[in-house]
Amino acid sequence: MATDPDPLELPADEWEGWTVVDGSVETLFELPTGRVRGTVRQYENERTREALRELTDGGIDHTVRFFATTRLGFEPPLPPGTTPAMIVPVLRPEARQSFADRLHDRGLTNVEQTGRERIRLGEDTRIRLTRYAAVDPLPGAEVELPLECWLGVWTDGTVNVATSGYPTVPLATQFDLEADDQPLRKSANDYREEFRSLLRALQ
């Protein structure tokens, strides 16, 4: 039986504002040749959540920024001569469908794929990203929250997956809050750059 993969974790110096909310090892999907296992770490930006909760007097106590990593393993192991990079074209469509399903499971609506791009991680690795738009209904709030979400898949000897989601508008603007706290004033571009910084930190 194959050993489950080690977790893909954020370095300690990237943890500011983030906390681990879940860690698990699970079968992600089945292929004709066997099962794909994943060691998952899910992070939430607690600093943003706390700032929003405080300024709404507890009216909105909800995850509005998330980041997750998964390192994949194969059961049984890949046969000799088959590298993880050779499997990625098969895995990527499965990962996209799985991520869309998970966004729906989080209660998000209007989930749709809106684009793709590539970025470089270090000198030798490129990651192919898929962008999604979604809406968080935010139970208990008077307005909804539009989100931009991402899925990235790449190899570095193993197959890695990273996902994220964040608001597309400053939270202070969306909820008409007078906020000096930086977490509530960040734009979609700010969030996007932080997401890419987290990706690069995984190298």
List each language-model region with its residue ranges.
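Well-ordered, non-membrane alpha-helical segments in soluble/globular domains
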Residues: V90-F99, A188-F195
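A short, hydrophobic, proline-anchored segment that marks a local hinge/packing element in signaling
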Residues: W150-D156
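Secretory targeting signatures
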Residues: M1-L10, Q203
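Surface-exposed amphipathic alpha-helical segments
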Residues: A162-Q203
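Secretory pathway targeting signatures of secreted, lumenal, and periplasmic proteins
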Residues: E16-P93, P137-P139
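Short secondary-structure junctions
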Residues: D13-E30, D105-R118
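Short coil-to-beta-strand
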Residues: G157-V161
